Amino acid sequence: NIYDVNGKLLAYNKLVYTVNFQNDSAFQTLAKQNGTSESYEKNEVIYKVIKILERNGDSFINDIPIEYTGSGKLRFTETGSRLKKFKRDVFGIGSDTSDLSQSEKELRNKQLNATAEEVFQYLRDGTMGSSGTGKMFDIDKKYSKEDALKIMSVRYSAFLSRYSQYMKVTIANEINSKSIAEIKERSSELPGIDIDTKSIRVYNKSEAVSHIIGY
């Protein structure tokens, strides 16, 4: 803890609860039992957790720079170099084009100029991907566009950590007791999900004391 000269608390550590998602062998087992796919089972679990959080007044972390508008359309929330990097990450676009065929160069250009709707469709089912890309997150059509985007956000965060297969991805921070209780009660139907704790720094009247504590 940090105090001022009068003993008033300026900053302290606060313990909060987080919800995490990671790959689990249970998804493969469920897929075999239900005649589905691992992606289908992952999406089901993520959807259930997001609805639990929303129902209890908590929010989930959305790291994908696409938003759903009130008119039912999609748009990017980033521009310039940030948006270009996002598209490169999504489509796996490298900077070297010397070994690409003409058709591959055309596809590369199309992907770099993809609209929010096109990126969404690619992540949902692989549309506009290169040969052999597959169905990406294979998000079932039963989910609305808005819900599919929410599922996609969690899957995309896990996708960025794909080279560390069992690395946890944080879905939500600072969840309340209602969400904690419901997730724990339904743990048997939520493989790959766990609740953890972490310490965050809290600053009292941070603007007034930032010059003192370097915040």
For each of these PLM feature ranges, what is it?
Residues 1-215:
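Membrane-proximal periplasmic segments of bacterial cell-envelope enzymes
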